[in-house]
Amino acid sequence: MNRTEKEQVIGELHEKMAKAKAAIVAEPKGLNVAVVTDLRKKLRDAKIDYRIVKNTLAARAAKGTPVEPVADRFVGPTALVMSYDDVVTPAKLLADFMKDRENFVIRTAIIEGKVVDAKGVQALAKLPGLKELRGQIAAMIAQPATKLARLVGTPGQQLARVVGARHEQLEKQG
């Protein structure tokens, strides 16, 4: 790779690192091409970048970005996973991926400007994602309206039952 290509890679990585809400630094050892391709596809479908990076280029690209505090963890084989919207989805996808693979290790992460260790990423993976949270919030907003409709309708239903029971009682009496 010549100097121009390196500068281009640094510029591209810097731009992505600056936009990232979550950046996870991982160590992808002993993974075959098919497994990595499958992981890349899952991450790409979720609009998450997965890059195997040259450590010196990544460290230079990290300068002046939210990823800079973890640049010292760019040692050995390094994969960089970056998300620009949702911070939970990359953690969930990587935690799911790691269940079957001991070789893939999360070193550290930056989540919305905060340094998080591997345990923190695992804990984040257990939280509901953005879509699930939106669904829960919508259900919570709709719930009071549903309860109110039931409460408003209940007295009328009870009155109708009382009138119906009294009507049946009078018919039996004759």
Swiss-Prot record:
Sequence similarity: Belongs to the universal ribosomal protein uL10 family.
GO biological process: translation
Entry GO terms, CC: ribonucleoprotein complex; ribosome
Top-rank lineage group of the source organism: Bacteria
Keyword terms of this UniProt record: Ribonucleoprotein, Ribosomal protein, RNA-binding, rRNA-binding
InterPro entries with a match to the protein in the record: Ribosomal_uL10, Ribosomal_uL10-like_sf, Ribosomal_uL10_bac, Ribosomal_uL10_bac_type
CDD domains: Ribosomal_L10 (cd05797)
UniProt keyword RNA-binding, yes or no: yes
Protein name: Large ribosomal subunit protein uL10
Organism field: Anaeromyxobacter dehalogenans (strain 2CP-C)
Pfam families in the record: Ribosomal_L10
One GO molecular-function entry: large ribosomal subunit rRNA binding
UniProt keyword Chaperone, yes or no: no
Assembly, per entry: Part of the ribosomal stalk of the 50S ribosomal subunit. The N-terminus interacts with L11 and the large rRNA to form the base of the stalk. The C-terminus forms an elongated spine to which L12 dimers bind in a sequential fashion forming a multimeric L10(L12)X complex.
Function: Forms part of the ribosomal stalk, playing a central role in the interaction of the ribosome with GTP-bound translation factors.
